[in-house]
C-alpha cells in the first residue's frame, strides 16, 4: 500500500514539475528563477481546481450520453466547445 501511495505522489510531482517548467519557459530562462513553496502550492491548487472543473463537465457529458465512464471523446469535445461558452472559473 505504501509503494502505491509513493508512486501516486511521485506522478503528481512529475506533473506539477512539468507545469512549472512550462510556465517558466514561457516567460524567461527557467534556470534564472526559482519558485517559492507558496507559489508552487498556489499553482497546484489552481491546477487541481481546473482539472476538477474539466472532469465535472466531462462527467455531465457522459451522463448525457447515458454512460458512467468518461471517455477520451468527452475530453476532446470539452476542448472543442471550451471557447464557445463563458468559463465558470
Curated annotation (Swiss-Prot):
GO terms for cellular component: nucleus. GO terms for molecular function: DNA binding; protein heterodimerization activity. It comes from the Eukaryota. Disulfide bonds: none annotated. InterPro entries: Histone-fold, Histone_H2A/H2B/H3. Belongs to the histone H3 family. This is Histone H3.v2. It comes from Dictyostelium discoideum (Social amoeba).
